[in-house]
Amino acid sequence: GCKDNFSANTCKHVKANNNCGSQKYATNCAKTCGKC
């Protein structure tokens, strides 16, 4: 499945700060980071 395990607000900041390359965030913010 494709979902964000972290809060939407957290993932929004992750994407805004270009942190989707981090394995932790790519996994836990999969939907927001588009890693589906």
Curated annotation (Swiss-Prot):
InterPro entries: ShKT_dom. Coiled coil: none annotated. One of its GO terms (molecular function) is potassium channel regulator activity. Keywords: Disulfide bond, Ion channel impairing toxin, Nematocyst, Neurotoxin, Potassium channel impairing toxin, Secreted, Toxin, Voltage-gated potassium channel impairing toxin. The record marks 6, 13, 22 as: Important for binding to potassium channels. Disulfide bonds join 2-36, 11-29, 20-33. Pfam families: ShK (PF01549). GO terms for cellular component: extracellular region; nematocyst. Residues 2-36 form the ShKT domain. Residues 24-25 are annotated as: Crucial for binding to potassium channels. It is found in: Secreted; Nematocyst. Inhibits voltage-dependent potassium channels (Kv1/KCNA). Inhibits the binding of 125I-alpha-dendrotoxin to rat synaptosomal membranes (IC(50)=22 nM). Belongs to the sea anemone type 1 potassium channel toxin family. Type 1b subfamily. This is Kappa-actitoxin-Aeq4a. It comes from Actinia equina.
